Amino acid sequence: MAVTVKSEHEIQLMREAGEILAKVHEELHAALKPGMTTLEIDRLCEKLIRGYDCIPSFLGYEGYPASVCVSVNDEIVHGIPSKKRVIREGDIVSLDTGVIWKSWQSDAARTWGIGEISKEAQDLIDVTRESFFAGLRFAKAGNHLNDICGAIGDYAEERGYGVVRDLVGHGIGTEMHEDPEVPNFRMNRKGIRLQAGMTLALEPMITIGTYEVDWGDDGWTVTTADGSLAAHYENTILITDGEPEILSLGKNDPDRVH
């Protein structure tokens, strides 16, 4: 496993990429409303990314046809935008997208409620986000990868939620997916020892029901096997000798209070 340690210059470029991606997510969130099609979300996302002189990293990646994955309700990840798919009041919508800035990448996902949503749905969104931060606390040089993975999964499972096994986080740099894989559940091994300068995408994918998944006929969309709601929260992070740095959070994002 070749896990790259980034230089200070490379980290700064990833930091800039993350700042841009955070702005894209903020603008997408502000635009979400009932009646939008998921294709409209994709077109806006691509326009925003290119407006910051970045490249949409998802577009064309392994044949993926859009700049953002838009996953609704029981869709966990990789929902393909469509002019036929309309988001409705009460839906929860996960937006997963990434940018390339001067050859360096950032990747982040958010799940939002559309209008008024159920308490069950809001609790799911909250626990998914909180499980990310439970894992982040262990993202320090000298710890092992499984310290992060176990903390994410334990947080969600202790609260009665399903933790998806078939999809995982990853390293990130000049490639969207680099070593190591970062599961959202406790492994039976320690995993690599974390070093300052490593960059990872932590992305809990949590369900109200089973952790088992179905793969869609389109070759991309992944749904919960039991039709239960799913949520997704992701950030690109930097391992340091002290506290980890979240590279894809806006300066005024309320999640910075964690």
Region annotations inferred by a language model:
Residues 1-258:
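Active-site neighborhoods and metal-handling regions in enzymes and metal-associated proteins
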